[in-house]
Amino acid sequence: MKLIIQAGIVILMIASLNNAAKCALEASGEKAPIARGENLIAGAAVNDSAGSSDLTLIIQLKIDGKIVVDEGHKCTAIQPEENIPSDKDPTGWTQPKFDDKDWEKGEYGVGYGDNDDNLVIGKGDLAMVYSRAVFEVKSIRSNSKVELGADFDDGCVIWINGVEVAREANTDIPDEPEWDSWTDKGSGHSHEASKTDPPTYEFVELDVKVIGNPFAVEPADKLATSWGEIKAGY
């Protein structure tokens, strides 16, 4: 009897490890575009299926060992009921210049139902909660060490300055997530947040692409418009 119980425990441990390997944060392979100064990180917390009892996303971002985003970082959030800003551009909300002034304001984490959310938002009959946060970088190099961590339930997708850099692996979330994308449309995917204090993050390392100010108005656009107006006057 003792041997049978021990064998059962081993099987459960192996199954748990296999599930952890299947359900983990995974880097997209795209370089994270990061500027010196202000940057934008955006995250979608994704439910597994309709009627989910809880949803969570907490993000941590470290650059060369310095934490620039963490639990308690100021953010905005919304639970979408349509693609934002449009069906033609369902991830346009991840861009730095997107106007989120009408979104709810609070601090990471975001979600509902499990007492680990600073900004409580959402309900189980909708698939996602979107969040955005501005963070400051004083120094960045192409060889900077960038570590992205997330504590989440059930899935997540994360963008930096409009570029997807990581997501939960082995879900049914499409390549370009829409407002009604669930993690489980037959895959059986499920993932629980740590519910620890402080959060227990899953980490990935990101390569870096150093960029200019992502919030800046493009001078070239201004010039083209002005020149077009000048020509139109003749």
Per-range role (PLM):
Residues 23-114, 136, 145-153, 160-179, ...:
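Accessory carbohydrate-binding/adhesion or oligomerization-edge regions at the termini
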Residues 174-196:
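Beta-strand-rich, non-transmembrane domain signature
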Residues 2-10:
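Sec-dependent signal peptide recognition
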Residues 217-234:
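Short acidic, low-complexity intrinsically disordered linear motifs used
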Residues 14-21:
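C-terminal segment of classical bacterial N-terminal signal peptides
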Residues 113-130, 190-201:
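Extracellular beta-rich ligand/substrate-recognition surface
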Residues 126-129, 137-147:
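Extended extracellular/luminal ectodomain segments enriched in beta-structured repeat modules
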